[in-house]
Design a protein with these regions (language model features):
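Extracytoplasmic loops and strand-loop junctions of Gram-negative outer membrane beta-barrel proteins
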Residues: 1, 49-56, 112-122, 177-181
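Short, surface-exposed alpha-helical recognition segments that flank or form part
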Residues: 60, 123-124
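Gram-negative outer-membrane beta-barrel transporters
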Residues: 1-89, 93
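Short amphipathic alpha-helical surface micro-motifs
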Residues: 64-66, 115-117, 133-134
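C-terminal beta-signal and adjacent terminal beta-strands/loops
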Residues: 31, 78-113, 125-133, 137-181
Length: 181
């Protein structure tokens, strides 16, 4: 059984014909929980609980508590358009295994791992995923009356490493790769 609750706050300023800029920002606070391991068909069994109803309600894999998306578009002289989109997330949780008591029945446990946060523009360790994309566009009118646009896109402008597939297995002997992609 799964539950998902969220609230989104959003502010937008449209760019109209007489304005030189527009943009928006949206913040989403979400909470995803599960009873039983519904996203992991093969490794989701936990011998401590006889039925799904016996399992506790826990944070679900795929849960991301905080997400911020901001965008802006700017009209510059000579009809040059600049735009940006920023996506910041607290990190998407994944299934993980705790094998510190062993790997056999009634020994290995499952838990939910949250990727580590990293600093972003001096804000501190808040966001695990960080993406800033930029675009420049110059519209042109051809001699035959058709329109053409020259576009330059820069994806992940700050070259942030947005990893997935973390090593999340806890072992009896310390795992030197724990928490690494």
């Amino acid at each position: 059984k799964t539950w998902y609750d969220a609230v989104q706050l959003q502010v937008e300023k449209p760019m109209t014909g007489d304005t030189r800029w527009g943009g928006g920002i949206a913040y989403t606070l979400g909470k995803s929980e599960q009873q039983g391991n519904s996203t992991d068909l093969f490794w989701g069994f936990d011998e401590r609980f006889q039925t799904v109803a016996d399992r506790p309600r826990l944070r679900a894999p795929g849960d991301q508590r905080h997400n911020i998306v901001a965008n802006g578009v700017f009209r510059l002289p000579a009809d040059l358009m600049l735009s940006a989109i920023v996506n910041l997330g607290s990190g998407i949780t994944v299934n993980a295994r705790d094998e510190r008591q062993g790997t056999g029945a009634f020994q290995a446990l499952t838990y939910t791992y949250t990727p580590p946060a990293k600093p972003f523009l001096g804000i501190g360790h808040v966001f695990a995923t960080q993406q800033v994309d930029l675009r420049a566009e110059k519209p042109l009118r051809l001699a035959n009356g058709q329109d053409l646009s020259l576009i330059v896109d820069l994806f992940n402008a700050f070259n942030n490493a947005n990893y997935g597939c973390y090593n999340t297995t806890l072992q009896a002997t310390p795992n030197p790769n724990y928490g690494t992609p």
